[in-house]
A protein has these predicted regions:
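Bacterial N-terminal signal peptides that target proteins for export
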Residues: 2-11
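C-terminal motif of bacterial Sec signal peptides marking the signal peptidase cleavage site
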Residues: 20-22
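Low-complexity, Ser/Thr/Pro/Gly-enriched N-terminal "stalk/linker" regions
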Residues: 25-169, 196-227
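Solvent-exposed loop and edge beta-strand segments that line ligand/cofactor-binding
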Residues: 91-120, 163-183, 233-247, 278-291, ...
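Well-ordered alpha-helical scaffold segments within catalytic/enzyme domains
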Residues: 121-138, 183-201, 239-242, 249-263, ...
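Short sequence/structural elements of tandem HEAT/ARM alpha-solenoid repeats
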Residues: 141-145, 204, 265-273, 308-314
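Active-site lining segments of carbohydrate-active enzymes
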Residues: 193-265, 277-280, 296, 321
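Extended ligand-binding clefts on enzyme/binding-domain cores
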Residues: 213-228, 232, 281-293, 297-382
Length: 383
């Protein structure tokens, strides 16, 4: 049989099968395609940044973990990790990571080693876990278990906080009560728990955090116009910092994660309540990092729970840089010294380097790399 006959028979066979299958009922539901949402600030970003280079973040994360979690590093400011034997909240040793190289407040020789931040510790455990590092048994150390010391039970707040005790806030650096600092560590802790579902001592902490956030949302009753929340007294508070209404996004994220884990309908109710408080805002209240998590929760609720939330305002507020509270806070767009910097989270307005109270009209703002990485967490799954 020559090649032409083989091709003709194969073609006839394919046509026959297509005709047969076209007569059968479809096994798949035909749905409308997802419409691409337009975000004004994204629309003006270049499709291809200049210069362009793909960064191997997977390898960078592994290298970071190997270097930072090596207590045998030597040299000025090294190692970057130390043990904290204060046994705050939980009767065990924990550990700290320098917030900045050579931070004079930190390390084993300063304040008995108690000054460290969960943003660094929990964040690095989460990052290592994402790239396959078992942080529950790394060279004999259970860094996952050590994170329990950030659960502030001794103060009766009973949530994961940025420090192991409030006295750390008095040691310098401006870490007084700042709502996002009290909420965001709980999002990260829930994410870590997802990688280690059977970690000893995690279950009651996760329950406590969810209960506290649910009760707080009930107290707030749709009004998040406060600087922080006292999770011991269950009272909203105000101080010199502007109101952080986007804390509602953090409550919503944790409560929906808790609902996924425990199937308690109260948590689903609380997630919706907190989200709706955020969606009902009339102006942009993006403060630090929590706003895009509200959009993420809304998208998941629409997809998984049959809701129909319009959360386009939350995405716009994340990007636009017109925050009422923190002026200019959003996503940068532009080219600095030949480098496209579009997509970096930070301030879209600059400040005078001599007098920080004066705006510098010549400046195009400044970026925060860690905030940018944090924003990828809720934004990328929505794309």
């Amino acid at each position: 049989m020559n090649l032409n006959k083989i091709v003709n028979r194969l073609f006839s066979f394919l046509i026959f099968n297509l005709l047969i299958t076209s007569c059968e009922p479809s096994k798949y539901e035909i749905t409308s395609p997802v419409k691409q949402q337009s975000i004004q600030r994204v629309d003006v970003m270049p499709n291809l940044p200049t210069p362009f280079k793909i960064i191997d973040y997977n390898q960078i994360a592994k290298d970071y973990d190997r270097l930072v979690y090596d207590p045998n590093q030597t040299g000025p400011y090294w190692p970057l990790i130390w043990k904290d034997s204060s046994r705050k909240n939980v009767d065990q040793e924990t550990y700290g990571i320098y917030t900045a190289m050579g931070d004079a407040r930190q390390g084993i020789t300063h304040y008995k080693g108690i000054f460290h931040e969960s943003l660094a510790s929990i964040g690095s455990v989460l990052g290592g876990s994402l790239v396959g590092v078992d942080k529950s048994n790394q060279k004999g150390e259970n860094y996952v278990g050590m994170l329990r010391n950030y659960f502030n039970s001794e103060t009766n707040w009973n949530i994961i906080m940025n420090n192991t005790s409030p006295e750390v806030a008095q040691l310098g650096g401006g870490y007084a009560r700042d709502w996002w600092y009290d909420v965001y560590p709980n999002l990260m802790f829930y994410a870590v728990a997802d990688f280690y579902p059977d970690e000893k001592g995690y279950e009651p902490i996760l329950r406590s955090v969810a209960d506290k956030f649910y009760e707080a949302d009930q107290v707030l009753n749709g009004n998040y116009d406060y600087t922080f929340f006292d999770y011991e007294k269950m009272e909203p508070k105000k101080n010199w910092i502007c109101s952080q209404q986007d804390a509602a996004a953090g409550h919503a994220y944790v409560l929906y994660a808790a609902y996924q884990r425990f199937k308690d309908p109260r948590y689903l109710e609380g997630a919706k309540s907190a989200l709706e408080a955020l969606l009902n805002l009339k102006e942009n209240r993006f403060y630090e990092i929590l706003m895009p998590f509200g959009a993420y929760v809304a998208a998941r609720l629409n997809a998984e729970e049959g809701t129909n939330y319009d959360f386009s305002n939350l995405l716009d507020w994340t990007f636009d840089g017109d925050s009422v509270c923190r002026e200019g806070w959003g996503v940068l767009v532009g080219n600095w010294n030949g480098y496209d910097i579009s997509g970096i989270i930070g301030s879209t307005v600059g400040f005078n380097p001599v007098n920080k109270n004066l705006k510098d009209v010549e400046s195009e703002g400044f970026g925060f790399l860690m905030n940018t990485y944090d924003a990828m967490w809720p934004l990328v799954p929505m794309v």
